[in-house]
Amino acid sequence: MKNIALILLLSCAALSAQAKTLTIGIDLSGSNPLLSHGNFAYMASQYVTTEINKLQNGDIVQVKTFGSPDNASNVLMPTFEISRRLKTKKVAGIISQYIQSLPEQKDIAQPSTNLIAFLEFTSGFNCADNSQVLMITDAIESSSYVGGNQLLQGKKGLPKPDIDLKGCLLTFYGLGAGFPPQAVRILRNEWTRWSEQAGATFTAIIP
């Protein structure tokens, strides 16, 4: 009997250790079409819903906005644990509704895009358990690291990452949205290089 109890305890511990985390980063900078186009916001919300629906009981979803480093609203990070009571459908509904509401919100746009800072300083990615970091962003870093126009024109690249994201899937939904193909290629190449140096597996979704 004791042996059975021990086996069950170890099994539960193993399952807990393998729980994945889905971190959803929402770009509130003014260049992101998410803030101005309802159709884009809807498509982004549907993609997020699909990813949430892949999760299992015990997995974690955390949501955080980013843009300007001095904006207090970016400090909040609502966190949900998938369970029998809190199913993926409910979590997806809450987050989807928020994303779709963004184009209707006034004065929400922030003047800069600190995407690198978000990736390097946000805690809880849980990359050791093959988790995912899903960014809803046009991927135009516009910060003290590099100006947006410099990046888009290929005049200056992204700095070397100061973070270990080995084991994480890093997905950018909306990379280069609304920009010409040449700019999209530059952004994709830069973020692919940055992600590889950080140890992450990078995917760009260009709707």
Q: Each predicted region: which residue ranges?
A:
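Positively charged n-region of N-terminal signal peptides that target proteins for export
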Residues: M1-I4
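P/S/T/G-enriched low-complexity
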Residues: Q18-I26, G174-P207
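Hydrophobic beta-strand segments of well-ordered beta-sheets in folded domains
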Residues: A19-I24, G58-V63, S131-L134, D162-G176, ...
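Acidic/histidine-rich, surface-exposed loop or edge segments in extracytoplasmic proteins
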Residues: K20-L35, Q97-E104, C168-G176
